Amino acid sequence: MQLTRCCFVFLVQGSLYLVICGQDDGPPGSEDPEHDDHEGQPRPRVPRKRGHISPKSRPLANSTLLGLLAPPGEVWGVLGQPPNRPKQSPLPSTKVKKIFGWGDFYSNIKTVALNLLVTGKIVDHGNGTFSVHFRHNATGQGNISISLVPPSKAVEFHQEQQIFIEAKASKIFNCRMEWEKVERGRRTSLCTHDPAKICSRDHAQSSATWSCSQPFKVVCVYIAFYSTDYRLVQKVCPDYNYHSDTPYYPSG
């Protein structure tokens, strides 16, 4: 009895293994002449042949195997050919622009009764809001008002009572006090009128942060100082055209 010739092909890790099975020897007493001729010779063992798939046939074989192991949508992703995906748009840049810093805005007032230094900083957050920071250092006595005003605000002297009213009226510009800190004490120094004597003066340090939003596009700092022997009104506006992508044209 003879067994038919068989051939098995299977794929392991991208390589093709080919196993060929020859005819089995028949039972003793077989009358096959070919069997009699080769009876005295040992039957050669067919070696197991291993070969690689040709580049043309590899994608087909790989896709057949991967189709059984992975979902249809992931076949080409495993083969190194990812499917087309929509390109993600880059995130919008949220760069913070410093309109002017501590060294760009300051007001220094020195009188017989008062020594005052005010510094400020404005930061544009790029999302329609900006912050205004103030630092105040004063020795002596005097009344000072710091307000946020539009560029059209006229620089003029007012009565002392109107200064604080204007400071409260700045709320109409969508600005609010976000943080404030005040420290008070006494400081001794040489008397101004008589350097041979030592005088004690009131000393105050304060910091404040205001948060503003649109439509308050351009902000100016308005300082008004009144004392018995000195008066000062000052308006400081940043160079908005230098820091902004769109030009600003003031009106009024």
Curated annotation (Swiss-Prot):
Region entry II, spans: 23-75
Renumbered residue ranges of the record's region IV (linker domain): 158-166
Pfam family, one: Neurexophilin
Example GO molecular function: signaling receptor binding
Keywords, ordered alphabetically: Glycoprotein, Secreted, Signal
Residue span of region V (Cys-rich): 167-252
Origin superkingdom: Eukaryota
Post-translational events: May be proteolytically processed at the boundary between the N-terminal non-conserved and the central conserved domain in neuron-like cells.
Localisation: Secreted
Segments of this protein annotated with the region III: 76-157
Annotated GO CC locations: extracellular region
InterPro entries to which the protein is assigned, alphabetical: Nxph (IPR010450), NXPH/NXPE (IPR026845)
Biased composition (Basic residues): 45-55
Signal peptide region: 1-22
Region span, Disordered: 27-59
Tissue specificity statement from the Swiss-Prot or TrEMBL entry: Highest level in brain, present also in lung, kidney and testis.
Glycosylated residue positions: 62, 127, 137, 143
Function according to Swiss-Prot or TrEMBL: May be signaling molecules that resemble neuropeptides. Ligand for alpha-neurexins.
Protein family (similarity comment): Belongs to the neurexophilin family.
Protein's recorded name: Neurexophilin-3
Native species: Mus musculus (Mouse)
